[in-house]
Amino acid sequence: MNDVDAYLLANCGADGRKPRVVCLPTAAGQEGDASVNRWSKMGVEHFTRLGADVVAVPVTDADSANDESHAAAVEEADVVYFSGGNPMYLHQIMKDSLVWKSAQRVWERGGVYAGCSAGAMILGSEVPDFRAMGLRSVPVFGVVPTAFVIPHFDAFPMMWKPLLFALRKRLRAGETLLGVDEDTAVVGTLGGEWTVMGKSQAHLFTKDGERTYAVGETFSLGQ
């Protein structure tokens, strides 16, 4: 994903200086220090190699998400990167928090949201409850105009295929489900077109149809 993230750094509004990246391991907050530290280390090392100034901010629970110093650190970023873990927990901690409000201000001034796995899933309108095989879901931020964002799509085991069927059955007219393959990203702006970047494909499903987009192809959401 080096090419994708290099593109994000080149288009984050840094205006000739080193881009500032904040990595948030929040989605792994229930997994213990070892997991949080692993996600933080991977993010810092990755973006440092790409030439950015990077800091991992230890937002792992409601208290740290409302820490004013953490919120201030996020607000100084050009790229806010949410790593993987539990999307429901990530949404629970971020909702109405000072850190989330700071992140929103970053994007409003032209900065970049980057999300891995859980970090991408919270951008749709809902996150499926995998234990209920898609029959239940939890409302999330709805930033991107699609009902569900499903990462690791090409690695979906056969046993989870009924989940996709259940989610598609729940889609209403005009709603979509966006599946993104591993080592692949969908990059765009709200209200504009989205481009597939990385190594594989993105898949856009409606209740009755589907389209697959290869690297370099563009499409619209919510239209």
Predicted features by range, described:
Residues 55-58, 81-82, 113-116, 177-180:
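General beta-strand structural signal in soluble alpha/beta enzymes
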Residues 83, 89-159:
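Class I SAM-dependent methyltransferase SAM-binding "motif I" and its flanking Rossmann-like core
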Residues 1-18, 27-41, 45-48, 127-129, ...:
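C-terminal and late-domain segments of enzyme folds
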Residues 20-22:
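Conserved beta-strand elements of the Class I
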